[in-house]
Each structure stands twice: as structure tokens, then as C-alpha cells.
């Protein structure tokens, strides 16, 4: 018996047809490990064999003769024969031929190609197309859902704007990426050695590598996924022992959709008795400083206050905290360093002759700005203190760009100065604002500034010029915060604005007093006001409708008392948190030594 386009012996069972050189590619059976499925063509051959055996001897011989003659004909003869057959077909037969051809001409190319080539093809699809591809078949689903594909998708979108689609997804969890990436590379190499070399030894196509795909230039923090176990195995790929990258992508995509459509819920934190001057947000821990001379720490998972730091004799104007210490500046002219887990003040730094208005620090350096018009550099090691002079008005904001060796400062004199950490000299002065510069924000290589002239400006530090001016607030802008995806601003008009690509996309209104401080997270906007209230706009797990009702969370006075155990539990999510609280000392808090007050080097710009 002959079937299809080439000769096939009738004595050979149709469900055990071996691949033959004279068969077309679509006739080859898909033999996969642990998979008993067969191709559509193989099923048709088996069906025809069964129908043929049910015919009379004369009819069977007539059909076999037609098949044999067609198989022995040349290509041009076959075309001519088909044209003649089709011309003699009724409408019902033509309809049957059309439906039959529709399934025969389809080719599952991903099943025929080497797996790494399939990955390469799928890597050009967007997220929606990948989800649609996963619905084609089980084999396509395994390929389209694999970590290799979705890890690349996460690298392309998370914490950055995709150049192709313009979407960027929030970072959310901040754990290292390199271990997960190395695990995926190992899986990929194991796959190519195990599957491709055995099933496609004759394939001349060069194997693609994971390193060929575009990857992130910043491989610090992308996913909360732990690497899969190297000892686990599965039918096709190593199984997921933790959250798959597709799930990670989907979670962040939901949050980004909430950002885009303005879907959020609102929470109000009440605890300060006077205006909120400064905020800092690290994951689910929020620190706030106020005119009431206190610093409060909040757990945003429960919206509860977990620590109260008291010691300043006047309003707290600025603060920053890391894994184990919090540094604050005050209108009492001092800088205090706290072990915020025990609410203990570790050190007090004196040096400024007027209110300390701003500060920032990294692993080796503390920079502060004051109403005395100076910028001070406090070195954690060696005790050296340097004073930078050049501003003619109070210094309201300072920032460190460590990889460039620069310090930035913004002042009431309407200027922004760039200082060299190597020479301690002023390299350049920006002077485009016509009002006091209140806040500076850095995102990637972009510098933003806001002023009481009601504008926000974006600067090119390399070219030393203003590249964008953002208008939207009707009164002075007090503070801004930025990340890789967006910028937020709080102003004297009592509103908070969310900006993307230099355009205002949302305006958040609920404050009854001027907004004096803001903080930006991956899925939240935080703002503080002169009325002492802190507003949170939460874009994760947002309801379908917007706006939503406000949830107020009043906090009773702690009177400076809070058990260490509750603080430790609340702060356990802070990155690199050590459970050994008893070992915290002045030395490992990494603070300027007490003799820093005696080694003041004054630099005039």
C-alpha cells in the first residue's frame, strides 16, 4: 500500500512508521521522551489504512492503483493530475479537500528545531505573544513558559524602560540576580548537551548562547527568585523549585498597570504633632522626621509605628538610614547618629553654625548642608572633616555621585553646584532656576532639581546644561524623588504629581496643607505635610475602582518606649539585616569618630 506523497509499504503498521529519506518532513513522527503523541500526518495514514481495509477487494485495488500511479509520477505530472482531480470534484469534495489541506500544510516548526533555536525565536516575542504561544500545545507551553525566556523578559523590563515597547516594571524585591542567572545558564548548557546533541546531531545550525541575548548592565537587583536546585530534574527542563520568572514578571506587570491607570488605595499615618519635614522609604520601612523634634519609624506592612527616636531639641529637617544606623540633621545645628533598632543615640556631630537642612551618606562619607551656607564632608575613616564654601544662601539639598567622584548641592541662592571629591573644589554651577532650589534627585545619569519658582528641571551633567523644564505646580515645589521609571514631586499647592518621560501622568490630591516631603517606592508614593499627616498611595493589590476611600491609621504616643523584639521583627525585612543586635557598636555602625570635630579643613570655591 502507498500513502501520502511517497511510497510506504502496506505491511508496515501505520503507528510504527520509521523516518525514511523518501518521506516529507511532515510525515516524520514526533518521538519525544515520555510523550506518546503522534503527528497529524501519522494519524491520517492510520485512518486511511483502516478505511482502506473496510473496502471491497475491487475498490481497494482501484484506490491503491491510483496511489501507486501518483507516487511514481514526476512533480509536474502530479500537479497536472491534481488539477484534473480537483476539476472533477463536487463542492462538498472541494470543501473536504480544503479542510484536509488546512491541517496538512501546518508545520510545528518548534518541535522540529533544536530547542535553543526555539528559544531564540521566542525571545523576539512580547509578553502577550508568549502567553498566546503557550496555548498552542503542551510542547509550546513548556518552551514559552521556560525561565530562559522570562528571565530575559524580566531583564529587559524590570527597573528600566524597554526600548522596544516603552514599558518599565517596578523592581519590588531587591535580591541579587547573579545566582539566578548562573543557574539558568547551567540549565541551558545542560539542555543543549542532553537534548540537542542526541536528537539533532545532523543540524548545521550554530547553537545560541544565553549570553547572546541582551542582558542588564546593572545586575544588582532584579528578582526575588532563588536559583533552582541543580540536583532536580524533569521531563524536559529542570523544574521550578521557587517562583518562576513568568510569575515574577506577571506580578510586576500588575503593579505597573496600576501605576499606568492610577489604581491605588490610600492610607493616612497620624502620629506627628507638627509638620513632617523629611521622609525615607526602604522596602516596607518608612522613616519620618518632624518639626516636633522626633523621628518615627513605620512598618508599612502593618501601617504601625515601630520606633520613636527622641533627642533633638528642635525640628528634624533631614534623615537617612541603612542596614544598622540612622543619621539625622536638625534645626538645633547638630547631626545625630542612631542605632534605630534600640532607639539609642550613638554619636552627636557638631560643626555647623546654623540649622542642618540636608544630608546624605554612603559607605565612607557623610555630606551635610546647612543654613550657614556651607557643605561639610565628614569622612567615616580618619576623622577628616572638610567644609566647602561657595553658596550665598542656605544649602537645602546634597547628593553624592560616587562613581564620578562628585558631590551636588542646591541652595536658596537659586544655584546648583558640582563639587569634586578629589580636589574639594567647585567644578560647575547651574543657575537656570529663578527661585530657591529646594531638592535634588538622581536617577541613572539624570539629575533633577525643584525650586520655589514652581518648576522642575532635568540636567545633563556631562554637557552641563538644562535639558527639560517641567511645569505643572501652581506654587513652589518643596521636594522631589525619582527612580528609574518615574519622578514624583510635592509642592506648596498641596498636591503630589507623578511624572513619566517628563510628562505629568497623575495628580494626587488630598493634603489640606503644603506638601513638604515625598518618598517613592516601587509600588507606593509617600508624602508628608505641614499638618503632620503622612499619606501613602499604594499601587500594589489596588482595587478595580479609583479613587478609593482613605484608610486612616492613628498612632498613640509611645513616649519613647518600644520593646526591642517588636522593632527587630518589623525591621527584619531591611536588606542585609543582621539578627545579632547585641553586637552592634559604634565601630561597626561605621560613623565619623569623635575627633572629626577637630579636623576642619575649609575650602572656598
From Swiss-Prot:
Q: Where is this region: Disordered?
A: 195-231
Single GO BP term: SCF-dependent proteasomal ubiquitin-dependent protein catabolic process
Q: Which residues get modified to Phosphoserine?
A: 229, 232
| Alphabetical list of InterPro entries matching this protein | F-box-like_dom_sf, F-box_dom, G-protein_beta_WD-40_rep, SCF_subunit_WD-repeat, WD40/YVTN_repeat-like_dom_sf, WD40_repeat_CS, WD40_repeat_dom_sf, WD40_rpt
Subcellular location per the Swiss-Prot or TrEMBL entry: Nucleus
Transcription in keyword set: no
Polar residues bias locations? 214-231
Task: Name a GO CC annotation attached to this entry.
Answer: COPI vesicle coat
Keyword Repeat assigned to the entry: answer is yes
Which residue range or ranges hold the F-box domain?
A: 107-153
GO MF annotation terms: ubiquitin-like ligase-substrate adaptor activity
What stretches of residues are WD repeats? 271-299, 311-339, 350-379, 390-420, 432-460, 472-500, 510-538
Regions of biased composition (Basic and acidic residues) lie at 195-212
Chief site of localization? nucleus
**Keywords in UniProt for this one?**
Nucleus, Phosphoprotein, Repeat, Ubl conjugation pathway, WD repeat
Q: Which domain of life is it from?
A: Eukaryota
According to the record's subunit comment, the protein's assembly and interactions are: A part of the E3 ubiquitin ligase Skp1-Cullin-1-F-box (SCF) complex. Interacts with cul1, skp1 and phosphorylated zip1.
What is the purpose of this protein?
Probably recognizes and binds to some phosphorylated proteins and promotes their ubiquitination and degradation. Required for the inactivation of zip1 via ubiquitination.
This protein is called F-box/WD repeat-containing protein pof1
Q: Which organism is it from?
A: Schizosaccharomyces pombe (strain 972 / ATCC 24843) (Fission yeast)
Source lineage: Eukaryota, Fungi, Dikarya, Ascomycota, Taphrinomycotina
Q: Which gene encodes it?
A: pof1
